[in-house]
């Protein structure tokens, strides 16, 4: 029983071990299958093979580059060898050429010793030198040794070497002989100094270096010593003297400028005016309007019965008035002699005379006067105007303002003697110039307007600066009977006219050439004082105020008649 029991027990244990091993193998096989489920081994093998091929290609390209570079290097080495051989051949030819001129190539002492040693030990090596080499070494020219004592071997060839010493050619091309200089010992070379030398004391501008934590400036040494104080003193004194001279010159120039009188005209004048002596900046002269070929009666002076008339003797053809024509005894006009010209009636100037005479002669001798310009004169050719007679009603021009200039002269009486006297004295002469307006009133000259415009001057009372008289009745050239003028018509006193209404001067009535009957003239003369008909406004405008003047008289040629 023991034998069978042992056999079966062993068989049983063997079966158990087999089962365990089979189980393990199955487990391993199943685990391997699970691992390769995601990626197959053929795929892995393909990836590995592709990586290997890439690496192989990179290696092959790198190897090709190396080979190409090696070939280039070998070609360069071959070219260098060829060049070396050619250079050696050229050097040999040059040596041979130079040897003909006594050139001896330099050989190092060591190489000569080696050659002698090799020649002295031929038996040891067992090789005997060739006889040809020995002959070449012994056949070196000995002439060079003897000639080396007399002249330098390395010198440039000269003419004497070729037997041409008798030709004296310039030798500027020969290099200068440099004398051998002794080498400086190594001890005399500049040494590196570890410490910089101390700088010299030089005077410099003092600088104040302030810091927040310090209350005083940093003290520095500026190189000022007892020897240099005199130089600094001289320099500072020179600066002080220079500044003092500059200030003195400035004060002298300022004193000269203050001492010079200031002239307004010289300041306003331009350099061109000053260079041509035309430093006048006065207002321009007023224009004169006149008609050539027109003869106008001369206006006479009007005064009161108690006052004597002004001196006569004025010439109508003169363009300027002499200062003697003024009444020097008259106290009212005495103060106007120096400042303004005589205030008498002055005739107008025709265009011919104005072109010949200067402009400043027609309006006075004083060029510096800045009074207001005179009013223009408007005339009509072919008309004859009466001369202004003296009237007892008109105020004296020399009287004060408000007394003489406010009265308007009445209408003159129609008398035959007046017509006869005018007809005898003057005929129809169209060459006589037109007279200027009467500017003899005192108020026209006492307060002349300034050149600068002022708003106060344009008020109502300030504009009454001009005082113009009323012209007389014009001369009638038609045949009028003497019976019509025998009636003594006494004119009534006209209303007073303010100074503002007398600003503008009414021109003298021109001569009427139309035929008017005597009856109409008589009727007009009778009713001139009682009735203010339109005809009366035409004949006499003295009593009418300035603002109510009829528009019928606006035309200077009187086209109504």
Swiss-Prot record:
Subunit text: Component of the SKA complex, composed of ska1, ska2 and ska3.
Keywords: Cell cycle, Cell division, Centromere, Chromosome, Cytoplasm, Cytoskeleton, Kinetochore, Microtubule, Mitosis
Disordered as annotated region, ranges: 105-131, 304-327, 391-413
Domain of life: Eukaryota
GO terms of molecular function: microtubule binding
Ubl conjugation listed as a keyword: no
GO cellular component, one term: cytoplasm
UniProt main location, coarse: cytoplasm
Function: Component of the SKA complex, a microtubule plus end-binding complex of the outer kinetochore that stabilizes spindle microtubule-kinetochore attachments, promotes alignment of chromosomes at the mitotic spindle equator (chromosome congression) and assists suppression of the spindle assembly checkpoint. Kinetochores, consisting of a centromere-associated inner segment and a microtubule-contacting outer segment, play a crucial role in chromosome segregation by mediating the physical connection between centromeric DNA and spindle microtubules.
Protein family membership: Belongs to the SKA3 family.
Name of the gene encoding the protein in the UniProt record: ska3
Localization: Cytoplasm, Cytoskeleton, Spindle; Chromosome, Centromere, Kinetochore
Any Gene Ontology biological process: regulation of microtubule polymerization or depolymerization
Protein name in the entry: SKA complex subunit 3
Comp. bias regions, Basic and acidic residues: 111-124
Disulphide bonds in the chain: none
